[in-house]
UniProtKB/Swiss-Prot annotation:
Motif YXXZ motif: where in chain: 248-251
Its biological purpose: Plays a critical role in catalyzing the release of class II-associated invariant chain peptide (CLIP) from newly synthesized MHC class II molecules and freeing the peptide binding site for acquisition of antigenic peptides.
Domain Ig-like C1-type: 114-204
UniProt cross-references to SUPFAM superfamilies, sorted A to Z: Immunoglobulin, MHC antigen-recognition domain
Organism lineage string: Eukaryota, Metazoa, Chordata, Craniata, Vertebrata
Annotated GO CC locations: late endosome membrane; lysosomal membrane; MHC class II protein complex
Annotated TM spans: 219-239
Region (Connecting peptide): 208-218
Family to which this protein belongs: Belongs to the MHC class II family.
PROSITE patterns: IG_LIKE, IG_MHC
Disulfide bonds: C29-C97, C43-C53, C135-C192
Ranges of the Cytoplasmic topological domain: 240-261
Protein name in the entry: Class II histocompatibility antigen, M beta 1 chain
């Protein structure tokens, strides 16, 4: 390993310039769903260009650059292949992957996180229906999730038990969205049902349509008529009170001279 670091240092110093240069070593372990290592890679790069990589078939480090840097990659590989300790470590790369990853594999991959669900109306696309709903599902792990649409408690046939392809958020959680085009009627209830291993019960999000344009006009006219009638009633009532208070009011006692009845 000392020879490798010395080579990288010499390479960087020799090519130093105003733009800067970077030489780095990268090793990766490719694991399957059960956490079993399937592949091991070890590569040396210069300015993000691969120079040399470990080849498990031939048991050596071979050049990966066949352009202008090929002579450098070839010399680099020849020098590294003289390091017996490095070659021995690379030959044990796959078993080492298993020993290094298993202690924390279950804690990372066997965990679950339930999704958050929200249903909202969105702009319709690729449909003649006037309304489109979007069921947003996010923040869940693992990625497998099933989304079902229901109308008034009944499954919508074209959207029953659909497994969605989730997109990673970059924080070990996923997100996805399901769309439903429809022609709503007043009183309908649309429900997005999300099933995920992170929760024992399905998570539901409901949406109900508002009043139709005709119903909106009817309600507006009724409200305006009611308001106008109330105003007329108030005006008439106050005028009646005013006229009643200005009329003749009889006084107690006799208004005639004494002796007359």
């Amino acid at each position: 390993m000392a020879a490798l670091w010395l080579l990288l240092l010499v390479l960087s110093l020799h090519c130093m310039g105003a733009g800067g240069f970077v030489a780095h070593v990268e090793s990766t372990c490719v694991l399957d769903d059960a956490g079993t290592p399937q592949d091991f890679t070890y590569c040396v790069s210069f300015n993000k260009d691969l120079l040399a990589c470990w080849d498990p078939i031939v048991g050596k480090i071979v050049p990966c650059e066949f352009g202008v840097l090929y002579p450098l990659a070839e010399n680099f590989s020849r020098i590294l292949n003289k390091e017996e300790s490095l070659l021995q470590r690379l030959q044990n790369g796959l078993p080492d992957c298993a020993s290094h990853t298993q202690p924390f594999w279950n804690a990372l991959t066997h965990r679950t996180r339930p999704p958050s669900v929200r249903v909202a109306q969105t702009t319709p696309f690729n449909t003649r229906e006037p309304v489109m709903l979007a069921c947003y599902v996010w923040g869940f792990y693992p990625a497998d999730v099933t989304i079902t649409w229901m109308k008034n408690g009944q499954l919508v046939p074209s959207h029953s038990n659909k497994e969605k392809t989730a997109q990673p958020n970059g924080d070990w959680t996923y997100q996805t969205v399901s769309y439903l085009a429809l022609t709503p009627s007043y009183g309908d209830v649309y429900t997005c049902v999300v099933q995920h291993s992170g929760t024992s019960e399905p998570i539901r999000g409901d949406w109900t349509p508002g009043l139709s344009p005709i119903q909106t006009v009817k309600v507006s006219v009724s409200a305006a008529t009611l308001g106008l009638g109330f105003i007329i009633f108030c005006v008439g009532f106050f005028r009646w009170r005013k006229s009643h208070s200005s009329s003749y009011t009889p006084l107690s006692g006799s208004t005639y001279p004494e002796g007359r009845h």
